[in-house]
Amino acid sequence: MFKKLFGQLQRIGKALMLPVAILPAAGILLAFGNAMHNEQLVEIAPWLKNDIIVMISSVMEAAGQVVFDNLPLLFAVGTALGLAGGDGVAALAALVGYLIMNATMGKVLHITIDDIFSYAKGAKELSQAAKEPAHALVLGIPTLQTGVFGGIIMGALAAWCYNKFYNITLPPFLGFFAGKRFVPIVTSVVAIATGVLLSFAWPPIQDGLNSLSNFLLNKNLTLTTFIFGIIERSLIPFGLHHIFYSPFWFEFGSYTNHAGELVRGDQRIWMAQLKDGVPFTAGAFTTGKYPFMMFGLPAAAFAIYKNARPERKKVVGGLMLSAGLTAFLTGITEPLEFSFLFVAPVLYGIHVLLAGTSFLVMHLLGVKIGMTFSGGFIDYILYGLLNWDRSHALLVIPVGIVYAIVYYFLFDFAIRKFKLKTPGREDEETEIRNSSVAKLPFDVLDAMGGKENIKHLDACITRLRVEVVDKSKVDVAGIKALGASGVLEVGNNMQAIFGPKSDQIKHDMAKIMSGEITKPSETTVTEEMSDEPVHVEALGTTDIYAPGIGQIIPLSEVPDQVFAGKMMGDGVGFIPEKGEIVAPFDGTVKTIFPTKHAIGLESESGVEVLIHIGIDTVKLNGEGFESLINVDEKVTQGQPLMKVNLAYLKAHAPSIVTPMIITNLENKELVIEDVQDADPGKLIMTVK
């Protein structure tokens, strides 16, 4: 029972990430728009009073605020998309269902505009009226105030309708409404029933939520923040933290803004107070992340590096630097946390307790900083320093330094005292399977027991989430050998921690299971015998030339942590100046990705090179690329492989920087030439 529930909660937690992922963009617009007419900033920069600047700042602020004002709708659509595998029909059904559900509740309970705005008749303008907290005006519909819970409920129901009826067949005369077209229709019926049910069920639930909110926030908020911090971090390994913090961020607490509108939830209240220019009272459930994410965990990473064996320090140092910097800048801590969670749980226990105290200390000091993504330096600048006079954000720095010291010495002591096997202190090297980029999803699928053993497949920012039919068929050791930093098992639910490449692995696995991608050709053990003698060329030195005209940069400067952190192998970055990618050596085309954004080559001496054209170009679905070669085709150095529309890539991709990665460097030495300007005849690397 628990294991099945855990699997369902996993899916819901993943689904909630989609609407939450929209908030950073909205938060940036709101923060910058508000900052541009901040009184202190205007005094320093009087040019901000310019009418055009004022208009721009007002537009930015309004554009950001409208997202926070309509979070329930976004949660309805996002939850449906997440639980229905990303199908747009489910999103449309959720949108229709959400509107119908609210309209139904309004009609059943006879809710009017006057019921929503208690003092509307006496106010000069409707926007100045005080809003009645039990009711809401949702996209112009007077209805019950169900908040994000209402959106999540309708999104989940729309996804259920999609999964149940997307392939339904109807009689020929109703054939037009069969299949996916039937989903919004049946969702509408479900929405009416849900609206009627909630009309009577939601008011007592609403009273209960308000009572719980008042108890948590008014009885002992200091203790509540401490417990919140502990539980939120404790749920990270299970991927259920999104479910836990959502009520605190989006429902608990209330504030009436200057427009007379009731705003609920710690994060939403903070954003409303940012816009209103009033002292912050919200932020108790966000501020505590900044000290341990920006200072504590990077210090823990240094302690892990310091205790690594001398021969492992270089490798561990690179991993810890990358993970620590990611935590500091963005607040994405999973790559670092999972590096010690499975091998040294005692360290994670220490981390959880310190995270709880961080929330407590920030609350006691009166520091109130909002966030939209996570507690990294970027959010600290936007929501802390830009409003330092109201947020008291400067206190984060001395507190963070103290946490860095505490984290470092506690981790250092625990590692040495208990002889913990943190990265770099393992008894022996774990065998890592040589799985090229093209083969990795195939190998992971095999390790999971094959496609017949996959019941549900999903992924989030850092982990591959799989529900399997038979857990005994899963090769956990094999998954770790393929590069997973850990594997969490709860019943038949598996979470493999592959870091930022998890989503791409999931994407490729889904295509493999549907037959869209076939396995790269391999030499089998039982090859057809030939009368001709087989010539086996000895492995030797391989010269690798530039793949076109452009600039060569160090791999560390590639704007992607997976490549820059050498998670896929070593190499260089190439910035193309002409729209043609050529072969860097004589060899064979082993892989052309379906989206044409990456090519896998093998030299005559067996060196495998991946040319990944641009960053995040997989999302372009092949637009801007024209392949000039085929898989298994022999190519010569300088032969054109791909035509690239650089103008299109610059407009639609984060970067045109093209990583060139050697994916099988085991027992080989890579020599990188000191080259900046490149052309197809210039040597840039040698593998010995």
From Swiss-Prot:
Record remark: domains: The EIIC domain forms the PTS system translocation channel and contains the specific substrate-binding site.
Stretches assigned to the PTS EIIB type-1 domain: 438-519
NCBIfam families documented for this protein: EIIB_glc, PTBA, PTS-II-BC-glcB
Gene transcribed to yield this protein: glcB
Keywords for the protein's UniProt record, in alphabetical order: Cell membrane, Kinase, Membrane, Phosphotransferase system, Sugar transport, Transferase, Transmembrane, Transmembrane helix, Transport
Domain PTS EIIA type-1: 560-664
Name of this chain's protein: PTS system glucoside-specific EIICBA component
Membrane topology, record value: Multi-pass membrane protein
A GO-annotated cellular component: plasma membrane
A biological process from GO: phosphoenolpyruvate-dependent sugar phosphotransferase system
